[in-house]
Curated annotation (Swiss-Prot):
It catalyses: sulfate + ATP + H(+) = adenosine 5'-phosphosulfate + diphosphate. Pathway: Sulfur metabolism; hydrogen sulfide biosynthesis; sulfite from sulfate: step 1/3. It comes from the Bacteria. InterPro entries: ATP-Sase_PUA-like_dom, PUA-like_sf, Rossmann-like_a/b/a_fold, SO4_adenylyltransferase_pro, Sulfurylase_cat_dom, Sulphate_adenylyltransferase. Its EC number is 2.7.7.4. Keywords: ATP-binding, Nucleotide-binding, Nucleotidyltransferase, Transferase. The gene is sat. CDD domains: ATPS. SUPFAM superfamilies: Nucleotidylyl transferase, PUA domain-like. One of its GO terms (biological process) is hydrogen sulfide biosynthetic process. This is Sulfate adenylyltransferase. Pfam families: ATP-sulfurylase, PUA_2. Belongs to the sulfate adenylyltransferase family.
Length: 403
């Protein structure tokens, strides 16, 4: 058996990253182009376009693709796509840019020219409408909503050429990987069914349990962590990487899972983001996506299993990557081990509910972490990290306590 096909009608990866002489030529041309500044989210999206993670997109979306993605989870040509991938700028700058012009795309933090774009469309959007459709709320306290509302007032659509993957390859050497690289690793391992485990938290016992369930039914698991920006109080990617390494070294059979990373910022779009996570994992070669409690959620904006239900609401042929839906998991003292609502007959009094939010709150406030919450080797890494912090970040517990 072979790996799942890349997303889209052509079923081939479409990386937009230039190399060699073509890269040098385009970088030289970009020096004389008008500059458009990229937010952190837009830079991550551009890199994903570059490495083929957002196959089959050829650039930032025009109006019809934006509208279709927002309202119907599909592009203008009917290809399934659940979240808009857009670039914005101010009205003042947009007025100066002509259709057909080429612009240099510059990361706002590093100042690096990340790529170039041919402007094919300029269009204004109803930001609140996008937020209500994608996030199911336009509450500015939602970090994803705030991200959209802070965008420029005009979107620029057009095809891109990508120059750089930023600092990700050097900063996360051996962890950050392109779809072509993960696919080769899976093939070299003889894997055809691969489950992706999405994480933005250090792995606690529930996470470990989910991954081991997937190992039982798939050839292997890609522990695939987000390397881009998160909200305040979340734990940085380098710390999470170290936590995953010690967990894999001490509690997993060698050759059953691979740690990887990808360059996106978190959108916190809950169910819709779960669909995007499955879509780009298909490009990375994964046949399944582990979907647990409150996947990609934040606060109490989504029900604990809304991300399960949304996969039942899309066309059956929308994605080749399928969800592995796993119920609420916890440590049960009477079962004397990890369990789920489907396997444990006991009551809440017998259970230790494990979540990343709870773990961060306990560590941030210097509380003792209960036994069975996380492996001691992982806690040692986390204690070292929290000892370096000079400011305390308040972490609110939500009803769903998404992991």
């Amino acid at each position: 058996m072979s790996l799942v096909n890349p997303h889209g009608r052509e079923k081939i990866l479409k990386p937009l990253l230039l190399s060699g002489q073509a890269l040098q030529n385009e970088q030289e041309r970009a020096k004389s182009m008008a500059r458009v500044t990229l937010s952190s989210r837009e830079t991550g999206d551009l890199i994903m376009l570059g490495i083929g993670g957002f196959t089959p997109l050829s650039g930032f979306m025009g109006y019809e693709d934006w509208k279709g993605s927002v309202e119907e989870c599909k592009l203008a040509d009917g290809t399934f796509w659940p979240i808009p991938i857009t670039l914005s700028t101010t009205k003042e700058q947009a007025d100066k840019l002509k259709i057909g012009a080429e612009v240099a795309l510059v990361d706002e933090e590093s100042g690096e020219t990340m790529g170039s774009m041919t402007i094919e469309e300029k269009y204004a959007i109803d930001k609140s409408h996008e937020c209500r459709e994608v996030f199911k709320t336009d509450d500015p306290k939602h970090p994803g909503v705030l991200m959209v509302m802070n965008q420029g007032d005009v979107n620029l659509g057009g095809s891109v050429k990508v120059f750089s993957e930023g600092s990700f390859p050097s900063e996360f050497e051996g962890i950050y990987m392109t779809p072509a690289q993960t696919r080769k690793m899976f093939e070299d391992n003889g894997w055809s069914t691969v489950a992706a485990f999405q994480t933005r938290n250090p792995m606690h016992r529930s996470h470990e349990y989910l991954v081991k369930i997937a190992i039982e039914i798939c050839d292997g698991v890609l522990i695939h962590q987000l390397l881009g920006k998160l909200k305040p109080g979340d734990i940085p990617a380098d710390v999470r990487r170290d936590c995953i390494n010690v967990l894999m070294d001490n509690y997993f059979v060698k050759g059953t899972c691979i740690q990887g990373g990808y360059p996106l910022d978190m959108r916190y779009a809950g169910p819709r983001e779960a669909l995007l996570h499955a879509l780009f994992r298909q490009n990375f070669g994964c046949s399944h996506l582990i979907v647990g409690r409150d996947h990609a959620g934040v606060g109490d904006y989504y029900g604990p299993f809304d991300a399960h239900y949304i996969f039942d609401q899309i066309p059956k042929d929308a994605l080749e990557t399928k969800p592995l839906k796993i119920d609420w998991t916890f440590y049960c003292y009477k079962c004397d081990g990890m369990a789920s609502m489907k396997t444990c007959p006991h009551t809440n009094e017998d259970r230790l509910n494990v979540s990343g939010t709870k773990l961060r709150k306990m560590l941030s406030e210097g509380e003792e972490v209960p036994e069975h919450f996380s492996r001691p080797e992982v806690l040692e890494v986390l204690h070292r990290y929290y000892a370096t912090l000079t400011e305390k970040v308040d972490i609110g517990l939500q009803t769903n306590t998404g992991g």
